[in-house]
Amino acid sequence: MSSPGEFYNSLPPITKAYGTLCFFTTVATQLGLVAPVHIALIPELVLKQFQIWRLITNLFFLGGFSINFGIRLLMIARYGVQLEKGPFERRTADFLWMMIFGSFTLLVLSVIPFFWTPFLGVSLVFMLLYLWSREFPNANISLYGLVTLKAFYLPWAMLALDVIFGSPIMPDLLGIIAGHLYYFLTVLHPLATGKNYLKTPKWVNKIVARWRIGAPVASVRQAGGVGAAGPGAGGGVGGGGAYSSARAPPESSNTAFRGRSYRLTD
C-alpha cells in the first residue's frame, strides 16, 4: 500500500493542483485567515469595485470542513483523476482547457440571477462527475453500499440525494449544464457534423509546454478516444487539437470499467 505522500505525488497535475487549492482554501477559511465573503462571487463588487479575484477564488471553495466537503474532495480524487489519467492521458492541455471552459461557462451562467450562487467550486466538481459519467457510463457505482447503479445515472442520483437531504441543488444543476455543454461541443456535435468548435487554444498548449505541466501532448489520440453518447457506450470527452472524426469502436471494446464497483465513500 502506498503512503499518503506517494499517493499525492502520483496524482495527475491539473487534478492535483485543483484539489490542493480547494483543500487549502477551506483550511484558510476555517483558520480565520480569510473570510468566505471575501472570496465569494459577488457581481456588484466585481463590477463596481473591480475585485476581479472573486472570479477565480470562488471556484476553489467547497464549503467548511464537513462530510460534504470530504465527499467533494473524494470526487475530485476519484473522478477527476480517472478522467485525467484515462481519456485525457497525455493531453494535459486539453484537460486544462476543459477546466477553463467549464469555469468560464459557470461564471457566465451566474450572471443570470436565477442561476447565481456565491461559490462555484461544487459546480466545477459536479461538472467533472458528469463528464466522468459520460466517459464511463457502464461502470457500476455503489452509493453508500445501499444502491448499485450505472455511472451514467450517478450525477442524477447525487442530485436526488441533495434534494432529499435539503442541500442546495443549484450548484449541481450548474455543473450538469456546464458538463453537458462541453460534452456536446467536443463529442456529440463533432460526431454529427465532423466539426469541432472547441479545440484547445494554442495559448493553453504554450502554457503547458512552457511550465512543463504533465506529459507531452500526444500527436494522435488513441483509437476509441471519441465515443457515442448515452448509456450504451463510453464517449471520449475532450475535443482538443487531437480530436479524431472517426466514430467510436463497437461497445464491446469499451470495457475498461465494466463490472467494477466503486463506493462513493471509499
UniProtKB/Swiss-Prot annotation:
GO terms for cellular component: endoplasmic reticulum membrane; plasma membrane. Residues 235-266 are annotated as: Disordered. GO terms for biological process: response to stress. This is Derlin-1. It is found in: Endoplasmic reticulum membrane. The gene is DER1. Keywords: Endoplasmic reticulum, Membrane, Transmembrane, Transmembrane helix. Residues 1-20, 77-94, 178-266 are cytoplasmic.
